[in-house]
Amino acid sequence: MIRKYLRWLYAPIMKMIRNRKSHDRILNDTLRLDELGRQLSESQHRVFYLGITQHSNLGDMGQHYCIKKWISKNYPASELIMFEVTTVIDRRFDFFKKLKAIFRPQDVIVFQSGYTTTDLGGYHDEMHRMVIENMPDAHILMMPQTIFFRKEKNRERTAKSYDMAQHMLFLARDMVSFEAAKRMFPHVTVKVFPDIVTTLIGSFDFN
């Protein structure tokens, strides 16, 4: 009851608290790059998994689980380093300056799969563009994507950015997205690959 009548005061205070928590989380996450630079061996191969899921959506959690499993299988000796999308795109703490300081030519960037090459919401497409524009020579694996843009200007912006990538493999999880990707960024290697969650088919026995 008190909250109802003091909502005008309560709401901005709670927003301020949430913003502060977000600020501290992103700052601490970014500062991990400095610590990693001191800890990681120069001979250690690294996989940077960017855009990991931040919420409890079951589909996104399934993608995350399968991607980690795939990385573990295909890069068993590599150091896996993960960051959320909000950390990557935050411009306040020099994320890319810190990342480029420890990133080496043999390292790999892996992007979260799903419905993330789109202008329907979220920050993943912005993250993809920022990474490619800051690190066009990096080896990048774009896990299976669906492509859809409502606005032509957004599609063109993404197409121009993605086509800058010198060493990116873009996996499309449907034929419509595959054809769209080939048109949008003709200099990028594009392949068809089913949703990464399908790799779980046959993995469990429910009898």
Spans of features found by a protein language model:
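A short beta-strand/loop micro-motif in the catalytic core of glycosyltransferases
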Residues: G59, H167-R173
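Helix-loop-beta element that forms the nucleotide-linked donor phosphate-binding surface
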Residues: F178-V197
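Phosphate- and divalent-cation-binding pockets in alpha/beta enzyme and binding domains
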Residues: N57, C66, V176-R183
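Extended, charge-rich low-complexity interaction segments
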Residues: P105, D174-V176
